[in-house]
């Protein structure tokens, strides 16, 4: 078997046949070819160059012509499955193999035949069509470069050596492109330059619009105004409860409606105050039972609600004028509580109409109406007492959490002293309201 392979592996005859081949020059000289005129093809100088005084030079033709050596008898006995690949598959090789000079072509054949293989392959460039070769000026087919992205057959890569085959496969794997990009290149190849530019420009413009247009949250589009009403939570419940406790605008408010509103119209009665305070205390109890009560801002709103409830109780009992704010001194006799009068609260906002003779479900006389209202309010203060005890626990927990936070830290609205001060203010205000009602009943 060695005797059969040795004649094929010897590079002597192939080297001698290629060295005897003379290099072929181009038919036209360089000056005539650049001017695109017919050349007289005279050597060493054509008539046009002699007439114009130009240097006439004939370049070496890139088309080397057919190999003059006789075909080997082994080529005719090759199996069909091992035939040469088509021109399209040869384009899958790296580009530096295509631009081969005669010297490089001789080295490639010598290197290919120096390794004994069962079936050697030859790559004559004359078998390839001229339009399939990628030229340096970029006039070759663009789709032909990307159409065949599969690696070459194993027989050819073995002839090129292990390192060169691995480099060729890595080069081919890096040429993988997207199918949409390949389709755009094919449309550009067939002359659809306008369509290609229109598609590219349109896609870029659409992408710019998508990036430049501000995204609007669908929830904000469908949510009613204000948006926090749709997000029902303890904060929204506290805000709604606090809003309900301010049914009238203050007397000195600049934004108050000036449409002829009477101070005695739409005023709260004693029954309305008691029912409204029940709803407010139930809402506060629900808030304090939630884990949201650990938030300092929510606790501050709850404290305001409880203080406002106590203010309405004092106004309904008719003792609001005898007691000032928390920690204030009593001033009995400063305001008279007569029937059919409005308890304006002495510069406060809680205004209760005491004219109706109905208190609860009982019909009372006008003279007994203030005393009955005070007794009814005193019986409702136990709700506020249990609420203050529950709120004091939450305030103590909030104070413990605030103890580890530095002063004036935005994580909590109050410091440790602030939470303890809120609890003391609530208890002092509750004692003041209850004591004023009891003193009023003793005087009556």
Swiss-Prot record:
Residue numbers spanned by region Disordered: 1-26, 64-167
Pfam families cross-referenced by the UniProt entry: AflR, Zn_clus
Key words, A-Z: DNA-binding, Metal-binding, Nucleus, Transcription, Transcription regulation, Zinc
DNA-binding region: 29-56
GO CC annotations, alphabetized: nucleus
Stretches assigned to coiled coil: none
InterPro entries (alphabetical): AflR (IPR013700), OAF3 (IPR050675), Zn2-C6_fun-type_DNA-bd_sf (IPR036864), Zn2Cys6_DnaBD (IPR001138)
Basic residues compositional bias, start-end: 106-116
Gene Ontology BP annotations: aflatoxin biosynthetic process; positive regulation of metabolic process
Disulfide bonds, paired cysteine numbers: none
Low complexity biased stretches: 120-130
Keyword Transcription applies: yes
Domain of life: Eukaryota
SUPFAM superfamilies: Zn2/Cys6 DNA-binding domain
This protein's pathway: Mycotoxin biosynthesis; aflatoxin biosynthesis
Places the protein is found: Nucleus
Gene Ontology MF terms in the entry: DNA binding; DNA-binding transcription factor activity, RNA polymerase II-specific; zinc ion binding
Start-end of Polar residues biased regions: 136-149
Function according to Swiss-Prot or TrEMBL: Involved in the regulation of aflatoxin biosynthesis. May have a role in nitrate assimilation and sclerotial morphogenesis.
Protein name as it appears in the record: Aflatoxin biosynthesis regulatory protein
Organism, scientific name: Aspergillus parasiticus
Taxonomic lineage: Eukaryota, Fungi, Dikarya, Ascomycota, Pezizomycotina
Gene name linked to the record: aflR
């Amino acid at each position: 078997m060695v005797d059969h392979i040795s004649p094929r592996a010897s590079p002597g005859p192939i080297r001698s046949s290629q060295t005897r081949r003379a290099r072929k020059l181009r038919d036209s000289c360089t000056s005539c070819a650049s001017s695109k005129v017919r050349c007289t093809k005279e050597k060493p100088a054509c008539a046009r160059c002699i007439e114009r005084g130009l240097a006439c030079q004939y370049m070496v033709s890139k088309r080397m012509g057919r190999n003059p050596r006789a075909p080997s008898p082994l080529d005719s006995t090759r199996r069909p499955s091992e035939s040469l690949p088509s021109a399209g598959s040869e384009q899958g090789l790296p580009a530096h193999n295509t631009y081969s000079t005669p010297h490089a072509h001789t080295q490639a054949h010598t290197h290919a035949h120096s390794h004994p293989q069962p079936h050697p392959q030859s790559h004559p460039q004359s078998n390839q069509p001229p339009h399939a070769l990628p030229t340096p000026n970029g006039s070759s087919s663009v789709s032909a470069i990307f159409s065949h992205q599969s690696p070459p057959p194993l027989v050819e890569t073995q002839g090129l050596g292990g390192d060169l085959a691995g480099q060729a496969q890595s080069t081919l794997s890096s040429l993988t492109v997207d199918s949409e990009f390949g389709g755009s290149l094919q449309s550009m190849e067939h002359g659809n330059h306008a369509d290609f530019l229109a598609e590219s420009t349109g896609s870029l413009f659409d992408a710019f619009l998508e990036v430049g247009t501000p995204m609007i949250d669908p929830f904000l589009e469908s949510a009613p105004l204000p948006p926090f009403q749709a997000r029902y939570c303890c904060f929204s419940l506290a805000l709604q409860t606090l809003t309900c406790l301010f049914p009238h605008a203050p007397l000195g408010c600049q934004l108050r409606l000036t449409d002829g509103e009477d101070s005695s119209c739409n005023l709260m009665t004693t029954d309305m105050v008691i029912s409204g305070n029940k709803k407010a205390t139930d809402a506060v109890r629900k808030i304090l039972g939630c884990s949201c009560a650990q938030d300092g801002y929510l606790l501050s709103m709850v404290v305001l609600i409880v203080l406002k409830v106590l203010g309405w109780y004092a106004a309904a009992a008719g003792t609001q004028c005898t007691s000032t704010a928390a920690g204030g001194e009593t001033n009995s006799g400063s305001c008279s509580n007569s029937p059919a009068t409005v308890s304006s609260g002495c510069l406060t906002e809680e205004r209760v109409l005491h004219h109706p003779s109905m208190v609860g479900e009982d019909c009372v006389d006008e003279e007994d109406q203030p005393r009955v209202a005070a007794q009814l309010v005193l019986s409702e203060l136990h709700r506020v007492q249990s609420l203050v005890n529950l709120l004091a626990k939450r305030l103590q927990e909030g104070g413990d959490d605030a103890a580890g936070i530095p002063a004036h830290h935005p994580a909590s609205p109050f410091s440790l002293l602030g939470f303890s001060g809120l609890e003391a203010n609530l208890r002092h205000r509750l004692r003041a309201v209850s004591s004023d009602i009891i003193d009023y009943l003793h005087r009556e």
